[in-house]
Each structure stands twice: as structure tokens, then as C-alpha cells.
């Protein structure tokens, strides 16, 4: 009886270990839509290759053989070959283009302010070249630069999420967002296929762009498989956001408290 019970315990322990291994592999596959069940396919391919090596009667594998414990080791190793991806950030696993990276988009916004300052300087020198009073033009340029510097400092402070964003601050954000800058390059070139699908129709260049914008490509739709139906068997009652991500610049800068959108909070 003791022997039978011991065997049963060992078998149950192996089954539990196997379940943990496959759960880990399934979790890694679920981290990215691009792996396509990679962790589940590798064990099958590994067994086919190992079986072919064992069956070889000539060549370099003619003396190759695997015992019962060896097969178990191959099985476990194949299922765990990608376990390191558990600690790999999703933006690395899902990297779709060479320059894609997780970074603070305040750098993009700062560069747009730099463009506006440069445009103001060019306009100043063009006015002077056209006969305008140099002192007045320089004074107007200095005032314009000071305003742009102050507005960027305000946007940057909103980005930090340390203070509550009240309606007055949101109204000012919208006023700043209404500024425009001139884009002369196609923003559909070099982007990932997913981002390209989210973009709106191509526009004729050059085009005036809002300084801060909520664009179609900022809205990442939530797949039907990620929705929890109201009649789910677990009885969960969750408000599932319609979007997987909402990366709109104005939307995120207008977050009332903290740094997270509703979509971010749901994901956490």
C-alpha cells in the first residue's frame, strides 16, 4: 500500500510540474501576438528531431540514443527554452521596427516646440530682410520665444502627473494644442504594419499639424477575444475599456490625477 501511494504521489507531482511548465509556456506565448504559439510548437519539433536522430542507422547520429530520463529532460528543456522571456519587457518582445522603443514622448513634443522657435526666428530674419524695423522684429522674436518656452514648461509639468489637472489647466492645454507646425515628410514611411493600419488616409504635403494631437494611430482597438461578456461563467462584472491603449497626446496630458488612462488601469 505504501509503495502504491508513493507511486501515486510521484505521478501527481510530475503532473503538477508538467502543468506549471506548460502554464509558463502559455503565459510567454500570450505576452505577444507575434509568437504564434512558438513555445508550444518547439517541443513537438524537438521531439521529431530527437526521434529522427535516435532512428538514424548511419552518419554522425548512428550511435545516438536517448533513455527514458533523457527523453524527459528533452521534453522539459523544450518547454522551458523560452522561460527567460518572462522577465523580458513586452515592448522588446513586440518590437516591430528597429527604432521602436519604450520612451517618453515629451521628447517629440519638445522637438515640435523647437521647430516653432526656429520658424519664428526665420520669420524674424525674413521680416528684417524685407525692410521691417530690426529692433521691433528682434523684440517680437524674444517675446515669442519666451511664450513658447513657458508653454513647453507648462506641458512638461502636466506630463509629470504630480499635480491634479483641473478644468482650467485642461483648457490651457487645448489652447496650446491648437498651435500648428508644418510637416513636410510622410509620417507613413518606416512605421510598423500595425501602426500603418491605424493611421488615417494619406494627406497632401506639406500639412499643418496640431502641436498636441489625438490621432487615429494613437487608438489601439481591443480585440474581441479580450472582452469579458456580461454572462461570463465566472461572474466577473468589469467595465472593459473599448480600447486596448489610448495614446492620444492631449488625452494623456489631460489625465486628472496620476499618469494612467482607464486603459492602463484596466491592464494593471
Each model region followed by its residue ranges:
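Metal-dependent catalytic cores of enzymes that make or break cyclic nucleotides
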Residues: 9-11, 18, 25, 29-267
Amino acid at each position: 500500500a505504501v509503495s502504491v501511494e508513493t507511486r501515486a504521489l510521484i505521478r501527481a507531482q510530475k503532473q503538477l510540474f508538467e502543468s506549471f511548465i506548460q502554464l509558463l509556456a502559455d503565459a510567454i506565448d500570450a505576452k505577444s501576438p507575434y509568437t504564434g504559439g512558438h513555445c508550444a510548437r518547439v517541443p513537438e519539433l524537438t521531439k521529431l528531431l530527437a526521434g529522427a536522430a535516435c532512428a538514424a542507422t548511419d552518419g554522425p547520429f548512428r550511435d545516438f540514443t536517448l533513455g527514458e530520463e533523457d527523453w524527459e529532460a528533452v521534453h522539459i528543456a523544450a518547454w522551458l527554452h523560452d522561460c527567460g522571456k518572462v522577465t523580458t519587457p513586452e515592448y522588446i518582445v513586440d518590437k516591430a521596427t528597429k527604432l521602436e522603443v519604450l520612451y517618453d514622448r515629451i521628447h517629440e513634443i519638445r522637438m515640435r516646440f523647437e521647430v516653432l522657435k526656429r520658424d519664428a526666428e526665420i520669420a524674424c530674419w525674413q521680416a528684417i530682410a524685407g525692410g521691417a524695423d530690426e529692433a521691433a522684429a528682434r523684440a517680437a522674436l524674444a517675446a515669442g520665444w519666451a511664450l513658447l518656452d513657458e508653454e513647453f514648461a507648462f506641458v512638461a509639468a502636466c506630463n509629470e502627473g504630480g499635480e491634479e489637472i483641473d478644468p482650467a489647466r485642461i483648457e490651457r492645454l487645448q489652447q496650446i494644442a491648437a498651435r500648428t507646425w508644418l510637416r513636410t515628410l510622410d509620417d507613413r514611411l518606416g512605421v510598423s504594419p500595425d501602426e500603418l493600419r491605424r493611421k488615417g488616409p494619406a494627406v497632401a504635403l506639406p500639412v499643418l499639424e496640431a502641436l498636441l494631437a489625438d490621432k487615429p494611430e494613437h487608438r489601439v482597438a481591443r480585440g474581441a477575444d479580450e472582452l469579458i461578456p456580461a454572462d461570463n461563467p465566472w461572474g466577473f462584472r468589469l467595465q472593459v475599456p473599448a480600447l486596448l491603449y489610448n495614446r492620444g497626446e492631449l488625452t494623456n496630458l489631460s489625465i486628472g490625477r496620476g499618469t494612467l488612462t482607464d486603459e492602463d488601469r484596466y491592464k494593471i
